């Protein structure tokens, strides 16, 4: 990421939660869907079908959030709310704990993981 480009940094930070879920899912051989609305008719930020697990970092309109929670419950999907607070490292550590809560154990160097995610984003950004 170009130093000082606030737009690039903002875009990276807004995408980081979904990129991190995707990265850790891949690490465990799990397929993840990003922004898919095929299940509920409203988009889930990230969804791991084999685990029936949805992880969301942001929040939309309160009514949409209530509806999502209800629809996930009806379909037996565990919905974890994990807001992006603090640094990417904080989020990645909290995400690993969230995965652990559903018996998905990830042992890796979190700082290294964050660097890999950032580099992946930069390569994608440069290719656009």
Name every feature range the model reports, one short phrase each:
Residues 1-128:
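Nucleic-acid endo/exonuclease domains
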